[in-house]
Every structure is written in C-alpha cells, then in structure tokens.
C-alpha cells in the first residue's frame, strides 16, 4: 500500500470534476504539500481546499498547458518550492472536438510536456526520490468514440504514453511509476454541452444515447482512483465506471 505520509502532491487540472474531488480526498491524508496548477486560479475553491486540512501547505501555480514556456517555468517553480515531487496527477480534460489544436494540446501534448518537465523533481537519479504519475484518460481511450473522434485520439494517446513510461526498465532507473485512469460517464462540466462539441454534425443519435445514460458521481470515481493508486501497480490502467474499479489487461499484439 502507498504511504501518503509527508508526500508532496502536484495536481494539474481544473477546480471541478474527478481530479478536484481527488484533491479534496487526498487533503484528508497525512500529506505535506499540495500544489495546484491551472491557467486560472479559483481563490474560493483554494480556500475550501485548505480548510479541509490546515496542516497541509496548499499552493497555486499558474500554468497554461498550451504554452511550452509556461509549463517549463511553472513546473520549475513548483519543483523548487517543493524540493521534490512525490505524486503528480494529470487531471486536465476538455471536450472540444471542433477545436483540434486545443483538444490535443490540453488533453495530450500539454500533459506530456508537464510530465517530462516534472520528472527531474521525481527521478531518484536527479532531484527526486521516486514517486507516482497518474494520468487521467477515459473509457474512450480504450474504445472508439464516433461522436468525439478527436477527444478519443487524445485519450488513446494518454494510454500509449502512460504504458510506455510505465515500462519496468524506466521504473527501475527512476523510481517513478505510471498509472492511467479511465473513468466512464461522470457528472461533470465536460458533458454539459455535448451537442456543441461533436466531431461531425451526424452524431445526434450517439449524443442522445450518452445524455440518457446513467452517470457516476465524481466523488465516488475519485475514491476508487485513489484506491487504485494505493495498489502501486506500475504501468497499469483502470476503468472506473458507476463507482466500480476494474483493472484493464491489454492485449499483446506485437513484441520485439
């Protein structure tokens, strides 16, 4: 089981949804410091987060995932402030299929950039002590999503990156493990305007099916994801659907 005592946690993402619920629940652990990284600060939500556990130092760092320089500068400041990073949770997610650049940048390339720039503060051969990176994907990273093809491409990319970085050779050298979470349909801001964010205008029936489907609450999904993290399975992928946790066993199609 993962020991949260004295850990420095970095969260890259918004002030809502599953990722934010994870932060609220992690504040109840005996962690040392929590750093929130996002393009805009929500002062009220930061105060609420701090109030959960006044003994944890909570800080905010502005960072734009669409700008490499912003990521580099913000992650350097966060790493120096903490000294080292134990846990990094990449929880940013947008569903804007008509804006390919933003969808890929916010969901995938920005996540990759921020992770790679955090690694010097996690890698035990550099300034880190080892740790864990958790990347938020989706069930649409495992299956096709005809109504949201661009979003699905980004989600598939997250899993490819996570599984590759979760190779045992990388873990043995760096001490950093990687995991991916694939939530199913969840009550969140992301799915409030589905009809405006489809890939094609031929997707009405697919959107209707999603809108009428049952959804889990972000709180229950967050709880299960933290449970998965505590199992410490490097390179693993987890589905969290309707509050139930299930590990994904990928099919091996090719091996060198």
Swiss-Prot record:
Biological processes, Gene Ontology terms: energy homeostasis
Domain of life, source organism: Eukaryota
Statement: the UniProt record of this protein carries the keyword Oxidoreductase: yes
A GO cellular component entry from the record: cytoplasm
Active site: 151
SUPFAM superfamilies given in the database record: NAD(P)-binding Rossmann-fold domains
Keywords annotated in UniProt: Oxidoreductase
Outcome (variant: residue 149 to S): In strain: Berkeley and L28
Residues given in the record as substrate binding sites: 138
Pfam families: adh_short
Binding-site residues, NAD(+): 10-34
Impact noted for substituting residue 215 to S: In strain: L126
UniProt GO molecular function: alcohol dehydrogenase (NAD+) activity; nutrient reservoir activity; oxidoreductase activity, acting on the CH-OH group of donors, NAD or NADP as acceptor
PANTHER family reported for this sequence: 15-HYDROXYPROSTAGLANDIN DEHYDROGENASE [NAD(+)] (PTHR44229), ALCOHOL DEHYDROGENASE-RELATED (PTHR44229:SF8)
Family of this protein: Belongs to the short-chain dehydrogenases/reductases (SDR) family.
Name of the protein this chain belongs to: Fat body protein 2
């Amino acid at each position: 089981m993962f020991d949260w005592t004295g850990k420095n946690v970095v969260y890259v993402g918004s002030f809502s949804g599953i990722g934010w619920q994870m932060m609220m629940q992690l504040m109840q652990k005996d962690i040392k410091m929590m750093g929130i990284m996002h393009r805009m600060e929500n002062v009220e939500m930061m105060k609420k987060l701090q109030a959960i556990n006044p003994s944890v130092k909570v800080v905010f760092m502005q960072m734009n995932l669409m700008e490499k320089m912003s990521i580099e500068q913000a992650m350097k400041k966060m790493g120096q402030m903490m000294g080292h990073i134990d846990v990094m949770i990449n929880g940013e997610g947008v569903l804007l299929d008509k804006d390919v650049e933003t969808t890929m940048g916010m969901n995938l390339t920005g996540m990759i950039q921020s992770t790679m720039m955090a690694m010097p503060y996690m890698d035990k051969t550099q300034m880190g002590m080892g740790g864990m990176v958790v990347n938020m994907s989706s069930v649409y990273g495992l299956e096709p999503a005809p109504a949201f093809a661009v979003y699905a491409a980004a989600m598939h990319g997250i899993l490819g990156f996570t599984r590759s970085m979760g190779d045992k050779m990388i873990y043995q050298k760096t001490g950093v493990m990687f995991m991916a979470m694939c939530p199913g349909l969840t009550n969140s801001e992301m799915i409030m305007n589905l009809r405006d964010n489809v890939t094609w205008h031929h997707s009405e029936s697919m959107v209707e099916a999603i809108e009428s489907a049952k959804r889990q609450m972000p709180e229950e999904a967050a709880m299960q994801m933290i449970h998965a993290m505590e199992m410490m399975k490097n390179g693993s992928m987890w589905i969290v659907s309707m509050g139930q946790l299930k590990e994904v066993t990928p099919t091996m199609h090719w091996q060198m």
